[in-house]
Amino acid sequence: PTVRLMIFLQFLCNFAMTGIGPILPLYIRGMMGGDAKAVATIVGIIIFLAGGSSAMASLHVDRLTARHPMHQILISASAVCGVLFILQYMMPNVWGLGFFRALTGMFMGMIMPISNTIITLAVPEEKKGTVFGITTSLALWGNVAGPVFSGALAMKFGYGSVFWSTAFIFFFVTLLIRLQHKKVREAQARA
């Protein structure tokens, strides 16, 4: 169950980061109006900030895991991602949206390497190739499913629904991680 949850978490991170793709230019254009070139530049900057902060967090997550248990970091990062998606929606201007998008990228950058580490520790050596093949495939599927789902959701319920539904999914995952960790702790106590 832990490995499946970590694979789902990787799918979700890719789903969430790319899911906003179809609506971000339209959402920003609605916020600021203006010409398409300015909107395209701002969207590019926001995507760059989110990706850059995610990469920087991934590079330094080992320092954090040296001081805090991995499950606590995952719980915190998932919950914070949920809050940050709500804050992105609530921002009155593109710079606030960009700031919270970059923070979201930072917390997602903590999730991916930690979930990979947990998978590595939980899977027997002879099954790692298969498990990481599945993990990569599902993570890449998140890159496709995110924009499809978000586009359909935005078309039916408006742009805000994309932010709220993604936040809800992160809160749900936070709960799943907590419950899974509790089960593991209880099983270890019985052993």
Name each model-derived stretch.
Residues 84, 95-104:
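Paired small-residue
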Residues 152-170:
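A membrane-interface helix-boundary motif in multi-pass transporters
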